[in-house]
A protein has these predicted regions:
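ATP-dependent small-molecule kinase phosphotransfer cores
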Residues: 2-57
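Small-molecule kinase domains that catalyze NTP-dependent phosphoryl transfer to phosphate-bearing small molecules
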Residues: 18-26, 38, 67, 98-143
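ATP-dependent NMP and nucleoside kinases share a basic, alpha-helical "lid"
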Residues: 49-52, 58-95
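Arginine/glycine-rich "motif VI" loop of SF2 helicases in the C-terminal RecA-like domain
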Residues: 95-98, 158
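Short, amphipathic alpha-helical "lid/cap" segments that border enzyme active or binding sites
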Residues: 41, 45, 142-150
Length: 159
């Protein structure tokens, strides 16, 4: 994980991860911010850019990666979506909750993801033009989607 690369305790920073800066409680003076959300995001962005520049092969989920890697060669930007029924069933199974709670949980997480992405990026969260490929995982199921994306990436990298 990003935290372990920099020897940072995950328990301390987890509450600031993928959250937009709280403007009321933070200040920026001479380019330095006291916002843990902003500082953590910038640290993550810099680490990801450095790993890509070093030629490392890795997968990033979220974290504004569509914009972080903009213009870099050999980067495949993928947006995976699913229909509501498939997402609700998956959340219910994974988190052992009823459908109503699953929908509320998804809405809350998506709202936070959107706020984080849109705070740090020029593109809007979920804008398909920011990605190389968008796929609905409910069409092929998860295993089928993985197989499809694996083949796509292999062909992309072999070009």
């Amino acid at each position: 994980s990003i935290y372990n690369v920099n020897n940072i305790d995950t328990n301390v920073l987890h509450k600031f991860d993928e959250k937009a800066r709280k403007k009321f409680f933070s200040r920026t003076v001479r380019g330095m911010s006291n916002s843990p959300e902003l500082n953590l995001a910038e640290m993550q962005f810099n680490l990801l850019k450095q790993r890509a520049a070093d030629g490392d092969s890795f997968v990033v989920l979220g974290r504004c990666s569509d914009e972080i890697f903009l213009g870099l060669a050999d980067v495949v930007k993928i947006f995976i979506r699913a229909n509501l029924d498939a997402k609700v069933k998956r959340v219910m199974t994974k988190r052992e909750m009823d459908a109503v709670t699953a929908v509320k949980t998804m809405e809350r997480h998506d709202k936070k993801r959107r706020a984080y992405h849109d705070y740090f990026c020029q593109s809007k969260w979920g804008d398909v033009s920011a990605y190389d490929i968008c796929i609905d995982s409910s069409k092929l199921d998860i295993d089928g989607t993985v197989e499809f994306l694996y083949e796509y990436i292999q062909r992309y990298l072999a070009r």
